[in-house]
Regions:
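C-terminal extensions of enzymes
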Residues: 117-123, 276-349
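A non-catalytic, amphipathic alpha-helix used as a structural packing/dimerization or gating element
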Residues: 100, 104, 131-142, 177, ...
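C-terminal helical cap(s) of enzyme catalytic domains, especially alpha/beta-barrels
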Residues: 16-25, 249-263, 316-319
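Non-catalytic, usually N-terminal nucleic-acid engagement modules in DNA/RNA processing proteins
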Residues: 1-155, 266-269
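Glycine-rich phosphate/ribose-binding loops and adjacent secondary-structure elements
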Residues: 134-137, 146, 150-152, 157-275, ...
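Short, solvent-exposed loop/turn segments at secondary-structure junctions
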Residues: 9-11, 42-43, 120-121, 169-171, ...
Length: 349
């Protein structure tokens, strides 16, 4: 288990100096496990430069106007040195550069942090992707230099690993080029980033994995649905992060071995069974379907919390089972068994 914290949001509130004074992000939240921080690049750029309404997309069904914001609507502007952006909290102006991102993340004190990168969409032009990739390459070099300086300066602090981020959208030549370029740099591991069309995700991750050093870990950024985790594992990814477990919880969706279902449905109003009978999480061992149904319809924030606890437990437990099946040599049997049941149940939900 690990937690990935958002450098952009922690920078704005409560501020990296407070987290640093608390002993780092793990100490600040009393979390005993490993921690990651992202670079802030995705959130900054999603304010307008890269994304308008959506990120997780199927390129065949999403229109450019749904993704690329008009210049006047943008809350962030990118140049070769960094990004200037307007806070979504109070409208104040801020500037992120590769060096500043490293400074913020060193103060946040996570075990693993990511280099500052420009995250593009599937709908940016090829020429823009080429220019963006070169910008990300140069930013990666600047991140490494600043990371090394800060590591020396803060030598009394625990070492923080730095991962480079591979971009290139849906283009094989750009993905492979990025993996070769960053793979030759002195990173501790690599994140595979950018908007990924689900239909081509496995192929893209495989392109990247074939070019990266075999002895360094690969993290698949923003991927966390059960089917996608299996695809990522088979394509060479080692770790994952995603907000989907909490995002779907806010819409009353519940993960189960029989697929995803919605606890707000009327059939759960008088069901006093556990939320998911086979689950050992805090929510399922303490509360009934009827109670969660009530919380959702009463618009109680507790509903989001309890459903998030369950959904996170479900995904973390799934990854543990995948790991065990790989160790025992029964991965494909486990995959078929899980997806056959999950897919059938989801179709009925």
């Amino acid at each position: 288990d690990a937690i990935l914290a958002n450098a952009y949001h922690l920078y704005l509130q409560p501020g990296p100096d407070i987290v640093d004074d608390a002993g780092g992000v793990a100490s600040f939240m009393n979390w005993p496990g490993p921690t990651f921080t992202d670079s802030g690049g995705f959130q900054v750029l999603s304010l307008g430069v890269g994304f308008k309404k959506v990120l997780a997309m199927e390129s065949q069904t999403v229109q450019r106007d749904d993704v690329i914001a008009d210049h006047k609507e943008r809350l962030a502007h990118v140049d070769d040195d960094g990004v200037t952006f307007k806070s979504h909290l109070d409208g104040s102006m801020h500037r992120f550069t590769p060096e500043f991102s490293m400074q913020v993340q060193h103060q946040l004190g996570a075990d693993i942090m990511f280099a500052f990168d420009e995250c593009t969409t599937l709908l940016n032009t090829y020429d823009y992707q080429v220019a963006s990739l070169e910008r990300t390459r140069l930013w990666a070099l600047r991140c490494i230099a600043e990371h090394e300086r800060l590591t020396r300066e803060r030598s009394t602090k625990p070492y923080q690993a730095l991962f480079g981020v591979i971009q290139g959208a849906q283009y094989e030549d750009l993905r492979r080029l990025a993996a070769k370029d960053l793979g030759a740099m002195d990173f501790d591991g690599y994140g595979i980033g950018g908007a990924l069309d689900k239909n081509s995700m496995s192929t893209i991750v495989r392109w990247v994995s074939e070019e990266l050093p075999a002895n360094k870990p690969r993290h698949l950024l923003g991927i966390g649905e059960p089917e996608d985790i299996f695809a990522g594992v088979e394509s060479g990814a080692d770790t994952f992060d995603c907000v989907s477990a909490s995002r779907v919880a806010r819409n009353a969706a519940v993960y189960s071995l029989d697929g995803r279902f919605n606890i707000s449905n009327a059939r759960f109003r008088r069901s006093f069974n556990p939320v998911v009978a086979e689950c050992a999480c805090y929510t399922c061992t303490n509360y009934t379907q009827a109670y969660l149904h009530h919380l959702v319809h009463a618009k109680e924030l507790l509903a989001n919390t309890l459903l998030t606890i369950h959904n996170e437990y479900f995904i973390v437990n799934l990854v543990k089972q995948i790991r065990q099946s790989l160790i025992s040599g029964h991965y494909y049997d486990f995959k078929d068994q899980f997806l056959n049941r999950y897919g059938t149940g989801r179709a009925k939900a």
